[in-house]
Amino acid sequence: MPEKSTRQKPTLYFATVLHCIGDPWISGAAALQVIDDGYLKVVNGLVDSIGAESDLTHDDLSSCNQVDYRGNYIVPGFVDGHLHYPQIGVIGSYGEQLIEWLQKYAFPAEAKFSDPAHATSAADFFIQQLLRNGTTSALVYATVHKQSVDALFSKASAVKMRLATGKVMMDRNCPENLRDTAESGYEDSQALIDKWHGKGRLSYAVTPRFAPTSTEEQLEFTSKLFNDNDGVYLQSHVAENKAEVEWVADLFPWSRSYLDIYDHYGLLGERAVYGHCIYLDDTDLTRMSDSGTIAAFCPTSNLFLGSGLFDLVGARDRNIKTVLATDVGGGTSFSMLRTADEAYKVTQLAGNTVTPLQLFYELTLGGATALSINRQVGNFVTGKEADFVVLDPNATEILSYRVDNAQSIEEVLFAFLILGDDRCTLATHLMGEAAYNRTDAH
């Protein structure tokens, strides 16, 4: 008996289709493709084509399932380059700056993840919040506990989400119940890499929290993990807060700078992502650019914790790769739209400007390019994975009023970026399948 075909019937999604086909930092408005009264055709979870609805034939229509999102906007799924799933219970916690905030709120919250049931429950809530906000790809911090990684990878795998995470490595300057050793951190991380990395849409991220919480021996083991395992990420923090920078200088008196510590241990490169990058000097910034290391811009966190202002335009001018990030729970929203709003304001405060298209690019193709997943996601090129978000221009009264008065697609985009939040997400699709639907969520 012949095997039953697993090929799914194609699906046509009707809406205005928006995506970047280039980098607006380089090519300006030419980087954006807009198809009014358009369609997105998905076959077996991949993008087959996009185009004008009027170009479809009767046979095209009759051979496909059809989903009517007319009046809304289909855009590529958002990419979040830095956030902490164990900190969802302390998001919006009052009154401290970075180091004090970690000690008072973050570390106690992370200690709860020694309980696998708690980790599983938190992972489920976390993934649902990402999808509710239109985020389809994310680089995430877990805790020191292996089960925190297992829980998040399991949930992401179940919904077919493109996600990278890793066990936090800390062997000093942290509570005893969150401390590993250089050896155990290495062994646990390698076991998790062997178990999860490259399985489906999952990738592993080697995760030393930041230099102050790792001994030099642990940083040596971190380098071995990062450089001996093909395709893994390295994620950490650098130069977020002035007091932190001073502390690091005391802990590593031999180093030229905070970034120099990571460089010394071979922890820079095209798959290394560092949160914040606010207090870096010219030598550091040149090294970031030359090595291809990625800076994760976390505006809501930087403002909430009073850390400082990242220079996005300056980073781009230096050809430093950047990815926008929520940094939940120091960050105050899962929404990449809210994050873009704050990124715009931070850039304004620095005396620069960032265009609506540049911000949209950072959320989609730009973030994917920074994380080296632009061959898989980021826009609607044929053959890419069909991760997309349906944005509702009538989600709120003020957004609807502003969009109705827009004179260009750039104004529509900017309205979403400045006025939008999770209410704008009508639906989120992973590999073509609806993973979140606003109607079902109520």
What are these regions (language model features)?
Residues Q147-C277:
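Metal-coordinating catalytic core of metallo-dependent amide/deamination hydrolases
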Residues H264-L268, L312-S400:
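His/Asp/Glu-enriched, well-ordered alpha-helical/loop segment
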Residues K41, G92-M161, G185-G198:
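Alpha-helical scaffold segments that flank or form the walls of functional sites
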Residues L40, G45, G71, H82, ...:
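Divalent metal-coordination and catalytic microenvironments
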